[in-house]
Design a protein with these regions (language model features):
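Catalytic core of the metallo-beta-lactamase
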Residues: 1-38, 42-45
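C-terminal regulatory/interaction regions
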Residues: 91-140
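Solvent-exposed loop/turn segments at secondary-structure junctions
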Residues: 11, 17-20, 57-59, 105-107, ...
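Metallo-beta-lactamase
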Residues: 9-16, 50, 130-139
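Alpha-helix capping and helix-loop boundary segments enriched in small/acidic/polar residues
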Residues: 27, 70-74, 113
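Divalent-metal (often Zn2+) His-rich catalytic cores of metallo-beta-lactamase-fold enzymes
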Residues: 5, 33-94, 98
Length: 140
């Protein structure tokens, strides 16, 4: 995905990389999860005050201000929390095919798509762990 900053406006364009107050869409079909996490970390290093992001579920009070670094951090934390919850289930011995419907992240329960998409997000992250990322990126 293309990310850029308009320095004189202190505005970043981050599109689908951050979707405030919303879990990842469906199975996140075209995302390399590890690279997404890395990219969100790099976005946090950019110099901007507000960002243009897609599929926002910001409240009427928040919407005029657009996305912020707080939203970037929340998106990144969601991915980290999801991965952590999956590993915790593995450690408990939960069968792999039960993990997506067992994982719960109550801190995100108010996010749009939580009930419908969280299990699909979990499947996607698990597949990334088991099979490697898509699209594949060569090392070095």
């Amino acid at each position: 995905m293309t990310v850029f900053v308009i320095p004189e406006k202190r505005v970043a364009y981050i599109a689908d990389l951050v979707t405030p107050n919303r879990v990842g869409f469906n199975i996140m079909p075209d995302f390399n999860i590890g690279e997404w996490e890395r990219t969100l970390g790099e976005i946090l290093e950019l110099d901007f005050d507000v960002a243009v992001c897609s599929h926002t579920e910001l409240s009427a009070e928040e919407a005029p201000g657009g996305c912020t670094k707080t939203h970037v951090e929340e998106e990144r934390q969601f991915l980290l929390d999801l991965r952590g919850a999956i590993f915790a289930e593995f450690q408990k011995g939960t069968p792999a095919d039960e993990i997506p419907t067992t994982v719960a992240l109550p801190q995100y329960a108010e996010w749009v798509g939580y009930d419908e998409w969280l299990p699909m997000n979990a499947w996607r992250v698990m597949l990334d762990i088991w099979m490697g990322p898509y699209p594949w990126v060569p090392e070095g």
